[in-house]
């Protein structure tokens, strides 16, 4: 997710389990995972502890809130990783597998699932980094993990903006929507969203590197001199372009849609189409709302930290990691939302998880028809096979 502003070494305590003194706090340019949003807050022993005097007592012993925080975050990251990977890959499979799912809206959902699947795949690396207090995976993986965080953040919010504009066109300009809202156009727009995200993702990939510090390795972003200026500039740009502007666009689109839905009884000539239109609009609105709820705390926290000095306390550290975890949690929530809010996704998920005899028959029938087209001479054999299957079903059918 947002790897843009947090220290790379999520735990700058050289080993809270074995040592009683904290290593120096990360430098302003050091970042890790979502914590990349703020260069000083990823130390579970408490940010900038050495600035307060470097006393041994400032690094909590085993069993203290820092260890509880570490265990809690590890458990949460594990759940998010498993649910996020399985759920998002299932969403992508369903959209690719079923022809009826290849709509413009679902093409955007595929893009969102791809970005979420990529970022959840980085959580095991970040968890190891957090627990060990060092980055053991090398420079290349460091660059990949940090850039994926940024790509996910920007691609996700750009895709949600696109979905909101798409819904606005479908609801408020249904005639124009016939030409604009096509799967082909949706795929082109998805590619454009990834290209736009590269404006941040690629520079971050080049800036990411590993540095040796006090016996440990940090996966960090390096800034040109003066580093404080470029670091804060990056935070402000992320806040504006990955949060403020997209939220304003989404708010305007849904404000206009709500006015339209209230003023018009029938959006189309069919009650069924009208019901589907409102249902899909509601689903997209919920997905957008959940995204904003999950990402608002970390964006606000980072921008406040960039502008004012926040006292270093255990509560601050716990709050910081909670904001990071909340941002990552969003990546596993979307598949759950689709399953509850969209009947088509719900049906396809059910068919995938619990194959029924009718689904198997339908798949076999599809394969048989395909084989018949490829080999016309086998048509008679296929007919006989179908007849035998029908007889077998009649024989094995339960008695009334």
Swiss-Prot record:
Lipid bilayer topology: Multi-pass membrane protein
CDD domains attached to this UniProt entry: 7tmA_Mu_opioid_R
Positions of modified residues (Phosphoserine): 365, 377
GO cellular component, one term: axon
Modified residues (Phosphothreonine): 372, 396
Transmembrane segments: 69-93, 107-131, 143-165, 186-207, 231-255, 280-306, 315-338
Keyword Phosphoprotein among record annotations: yes
Modified-residue entries (Phosphotyrosine), positions: 168
Disulphide-bridged cysteine pairs: 142-219
Region of interest called Disordered, as start-end residue ranges on this chain: 364-400
Listed InterPro entries: GPCR_Rhodpsn, GPCR_Rhodpsn_7TM, Mu_opioid_rcpt, Opioid_rcpt
Keyword Transmembrane tagged: yes
Chief location category: membrane
Recorded coiled-coil stretches: none
PROSITE patterns from the UniProt entry: G_PROTEIN_RECEP_F1_1 (PS00237), G_PROTEIN_RECEP_F1_2 (PS50262)
Record PTM: Phosphorylated. Differentially phosphorylated in basal and agonist-induced conditions. Agonist-mediated phosphorylation modulates receptor internalization. Phosphorylated by GRK2 in a agonist-dependent manner. Phosphorylation at Tyr-168 requires receptor activation, is dependent on non-receptor protein tyrosine kinase Src and results in a decrease in agonist efficacy by reducing G-protein coupling efficiency. Phosphorylated on tyrosine residues; the phosphorylation is involved in agonist-induced G-protein-independent receptor down-regulation. Ubiquitinated. A basal ubiquitination seems not to be related to degradation. Ubiquitination is increased upon formation of OPRM1:OPRD1 oligomers leading to proteasomal degradation; the ubiquitination is diminished by RTP4.
Alphabetized UniProt keyword annotations: Cell membrane, Cell projection, Disulfide bond, Endosome, G-protein coupled receptor, Glycoprotein, Lipoprotein, Membrane, Palmitate, Phosphoprotein, Receptor, Transducer, Transmembrane, Transmembrane helix, Ubl conjugation
Lipidated residues (S-palmitoyl cysteine): 353
Location(s), subcellular: Cell membrane; Cell projection, Axon; Perikaryon; Cell projection, Dendrite
Positions bearing carbohydrate: 9, 12, 33, 40, 48
GO biological process, one term: regulation of NMDA receptor activity
Family named by the database record: Belongs to the G-protein coupled receptor 1 family.
Assembly mode: Forms homooligomers and heterooligomers with other GPCRs, such as OPRD1, OPRK1, OPRL1, NPFFR2, ADRA2A, SSTR2, CNR1 and CCR5 (probably in dimeric forms). Interacts with heterotrimeric G proteins; interaction with a heterotrimeric complex containing GNAI1, GNB1 and GNG2 stabilizes the active conformation of the receptor and increases its affinity for endomorphin-2, the synthetic opioid peptide DAMGO and for morphinan agonists. Interacts with PPL; the interaction disrupts agonist-mediated G-protein activation. Interacts (via C-terminus) with DNAJB4 (via C-terminus).
Protein name: Mu-type opioid receptor
